[in-house]
């Protein structure tokens, strides 16, 4: 995997470009196949969430489950949202690499490590489902998505790119993070009737701390003999003015912050994919709850309140975790208590 930022070689194709084109073709073929293979099981324009889990462990259902894991951190759990997220993220990476003015916030914080980051996250997700997918049944949800939004990406950002960090991060995500979340969700959250998101967040935090301690004592897991310097962005970003336009962009970027993308184009792809899924079948995204629009609205409100309240922290630190309510208390509250305006407003306020 080679990342280049050389503006003098516009005609040279990166392996990333070829891989993304192949992935997009594969995703299109997958959608066509799923459409025809599931036609006898659904009456709407796309099979619902219940149709998917009822067909487990059939291959078509497993493909939908694994793809849905990519967007599950936002509680959308749908293949269209996941494909939209990845497509938007790649567009943002390409725009950053070629110095486009419309790139938005530099993806993955301007490190240039997005190809390694997303590769490690996807490998960790695949390994997690291979190792722990047997725990998922038609009636039992399990947090197989957690490796995509935790340790693998964090290790790439911490230790840099390269296959050693990418593969070891993916392995640790599948071996440390996913089982820790499974234990806490099934043996703590469920007996105490607590939301699963508590177990997910706690499990990711504990496992990540253990993994980083592991790397401290065995540094060869993440250090290469020839150090790789991550490629920089084409040009340094101008200092933001933290005005209205910046705030609107920040609200949108918060939707893709959890997988360490933090970019408006990635967020736009995520949301548009989820809305497409909802338009085809309201019972398909968001676990078939029909509450996708309520969740998106509440997430936007929570981010807006957070950006407004914590604007000074953004100005002082350059980054602040205003995205956290979007992937925790806000969607969890709506799924648990419904989509009334009281729940939307109160969860957004308390979350922010």
Feature locations, PLM:
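Membrane-interface helix-loop-helix junctions at boundaries between adjacent transmembrane segments
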Residues: 8-21, 155-237, 247-257, 352
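Membrane-helix boundary/interface segments in integral membrane proteins
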Residues: 127-128, 147-159, 327-337
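Juxtamembrane/interface segments at transmembrane-helix termini
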Residues: 38-42, 137-139, 216-226, 316
């Amino acid at each position: 995997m080679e990342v280049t930022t050389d503006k003098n070689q516009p005609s040279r194709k990166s392996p990333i470009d070829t891989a993304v084109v192949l992935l997009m073709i594969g995703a299109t073929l997958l959608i066509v196949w799923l459409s025809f293979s599931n036609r006898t099981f659904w009456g709407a324009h796309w099979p619902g969430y219940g149709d998917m889990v009822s067909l487990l462990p059939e291959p078509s259902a497993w493909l939908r489950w694994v793809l849905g894991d990519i967007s599950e951190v936002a509680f959308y759990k749908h293949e269209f949202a996941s494909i939209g997220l990845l497509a938007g993220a790649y567009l943002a990476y390409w725009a950053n690499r070629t110095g486009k003015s419309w790139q938005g916030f530099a993806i993955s914080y301007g490190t240039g490590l997005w190809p390694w980051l997303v590769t490690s996250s996807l490998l960790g997700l695949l390994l997690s489902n291979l190792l722990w997918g047997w725990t998922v049944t038609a009636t039992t949800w399990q947090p197989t998505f957690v490796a995509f939004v935790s340790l693998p990406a964090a290790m790439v950002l911490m230790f840099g790119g390269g296959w050693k960090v990418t593969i070891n991060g993916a392995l640790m995500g599948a071996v440390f993070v996913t089982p820790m979340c499974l234990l806490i969700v099934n043996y703590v959250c469920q007996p105490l009737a607590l939301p699963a998101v508590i177990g997910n967040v706690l499990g990711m935090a504990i496992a990540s701390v253990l993994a980083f301690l592991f790397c401290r004592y065995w540094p060869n897991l993440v250090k290469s003999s020839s150090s790789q310097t991550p490629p920089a962005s084409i040009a340094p970003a101008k200092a933001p003015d933290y005005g209205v336009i910046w705030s609107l962009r920040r609200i949108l970027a918060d939707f893709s912050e959890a997988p360490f993308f933090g970019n408006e184009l990635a967020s736009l792809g995520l949301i548009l994919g989820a809305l497409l899924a909802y338009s085809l079948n309201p019972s398909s995204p968001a676990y078939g709850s029909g509450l996708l629009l309520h969740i998106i609205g509440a997430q936007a409100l929570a981010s807006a309140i957070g950006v407004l309240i914590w604007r000074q922290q953004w100005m002082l630190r350059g980054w602040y975790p205003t995205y956290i309510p979007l992937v925790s208390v806000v969607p969890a509250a709506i799924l648990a208590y419904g989509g009334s305006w009281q729940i939307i407003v109160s969860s957004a306020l308390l979350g922010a």
